[in-house]
Amino acid sequence: MYDWLNALPKAELHLHLEGSLEPELLFALAERNRIALPWDDVETLRKAYAFNNLQEFLDLYYRGADVLRTEQDFYDLTWAYLLRCKAQNVVHTEPFFDPQTHTDRGIPFEVVLAGITGALKDGKSKLGVDSGLILSFLRHLSQEEAEKTLDQALPFRDAFVAVGLDSSEMGHPPSKFQRVFDRARNEGFLTVAHAGEEGPPEYIWEALDLLKIQRIDHGVRAIEDERLMQRIIDEQIPLTVCPLSNTKLCVFDDMAQHNILDMLERGVKVTVNSDDPAYFGGYVTENFHALYTHLGMTEDQAKRLAQNSLDARLVKP
């Protein structure tokens, strides 16, 4: 079944480039940039990938991202991910990147962007993988900081298809970022946002009504609010769900409890994605395979999930 799932044409709509930094590449970049790491070797680092919640993961994620310093580093990171896409028949990807993670460390915005977009261009020409880049604001920082990031992005507006919102969800509701999302939309950007991963259904309502998003990233807690579920079904608002991430971060205690197939059967346009695959133990095919192994996903359900991902692209073919 793994090979069949791997061969299925699919899109990935919820992937953080910084979260695809595999331990081997992390160590190679640290050596290249002469950065001391707190881990002795790759295996020690892998053992650190045990998280009780989103914040524990984020602490390690930001520590790992510190090895990304040069345009070549960002190219290598993105290219390694695109090779995974090619190997798993991900024909289209819409990855996030977090400029603030890097500009706050003194890395110029244009250096980050040049490395990523250079790789995405080569991914199209050399691998046949289409893409659209999403600039994501960090919600644990202020709206004013997000607006500065938007200002930095405007000279490069053609490089992005959308703006998004990620990082620590609890205590940082979408309403905190209404003004910057209004500005982004006025500048012609589409909008998406993480909501309803650890946060309550109210955060999803806010993302829809205040940020006017095209797609909900995560959204698994929508099932707790029947009126919200009905709206998502009626309006066919896509959800970019990340099963392995949800279990690694204890959103669900184990995969057998995951609600993605329940949502699919109720008519929700759910999709399967890997989120931060280097940290959560699998890329898109591994996420599909986990649903087959633990939830008994059928071939028909897998085809519908894959088709949903292709239908939910912001960049249309």
UniProtKB/Swiss-Prot annotation:
What does the cofactor field's note say?
Binds 1 zinc ion per subunit.
UniProt cofactor(s)? Zn(2+)
Q: Name one GO biological process term.
A: adenine catabolic process
Q: Which GO terms describe its molecular function?
A: adenine deaminase activity; zinc ion binding
Which residues are named in the active-site annotation?
E197 (proton donor)
Q: Where is this site: Important for catalytic activity?
A: H218
Task: Please tell me where Zn(2+) binds in this chain.
Answer: H14, H16, H194, D275
Going by the entry's taxonomy, the superkingdom of the source organism is recorded as: Bacteria
Q: Keyword check for DNA damage, yes or no.
A: no
- Provide the catalytic activity annotation: adenine + H2O + H(+) = hypoxanthine + NH4(+)
- What are the protein's UniProt keywords? Hydrolase, Metal-binding, Nucleotide metabolism, Zinc
Per its UniProt record, what InterPro entries does this chain match?
A: A_deaminase_dom (IPR001365), ADE (IPR028892), Ado/ade_deaminase (IPR006330), Metal_Hydrolase (IPR032466)
List of residues binding substrate: D276
Q: What is its EC number?
A: 3.5.4.2
Q: Function, please?
A: Catalyzes the hydrolytic deamination of adenine to hypoxanthine. Plays an important role in the purine salvage pathway and in nitrogen catabolism.
Report the family membership. Belongs to the metallo-dependent hydrolases superfamily. Adenosine and AMP deaminases family. Adenine deaminase type 2 subfamily.
HAMAP family xrefs: Adenine_deaminase
What's the protein name?
A: Adenine deaminase
Q: Which species does the entry assign this protein to?
A: Pseudomonas syringae pv. syringae (strain B728a)
